[in-house]
Amino acid sequence: MLRTEKEKMAAGELYNSEDQQLLLERKHARQLIRQYNETPEDDAVRTKLLKELLGSVGDQVTILPTFRCDYGYHIHIGDHTFVNFDCVILDVCEVRIGCHCLIAPGVHIYTAGHPLDPIERKSGKEFGKPVTIGDQVWIGGRAVINPGVTIGDNAVIASGSVVTKDVPANTVVGGNPARILKQL
């Protein structure tokens, strides 16, 4: 049975990101994001838009504008999580963010990747790897979380870090690439 490009994308296989269905879904997400980013803070419409855009949203989740993502429906955020402004989540695969997380301004979370081989990359195909962020994680400003990374519970990611590998629970990591600085 042939798989759709969307099914390939969700499975982390090479897929054509210019597929018509995917183009329409990204366009729909951009429309919701634009509305979200332009809606006043005290407006209940913002919560409604967030629930329409994302795969799941826990109780008392705050995402400050501006916020950007590819599709939205791959993003799942737990209760009492705060996402500061200028967050970008490229969600071609699942992104799970736990409960009681703090995400500082300008954090980027990427699930999208491209083939290293230049001929394959020229084809326009890409792939994704999921990102999982545990409970009570604090990600500092301008940190970058790369595809396929899992961050354990209670971890702290220092500002400006580039996280390329899994982060154990109860650790502080920092640098480019991020490395363990301290056990908590």
Curated annotation (Swiss-Prot):
Coiled-coil stretches noted in the UniProt entry, renumbered to this chain: none
A GO term for molecular function: O-acyltransferase activity
Enzyme Commission number(s) from the entry: 2.3.1.79
Active-site residues from the entry: 114 (proton donor/acceptor)
Keywords assigned by UniProt, alphabetized: Repeat, Transferase
Top-level division of the source organism's lineage: Bacteria
Family to which this protein belongs: Belongs to the transferase hexapeptide repeat family.
Name under which the protein is recorded: Probable maltose O-acetyltransferase
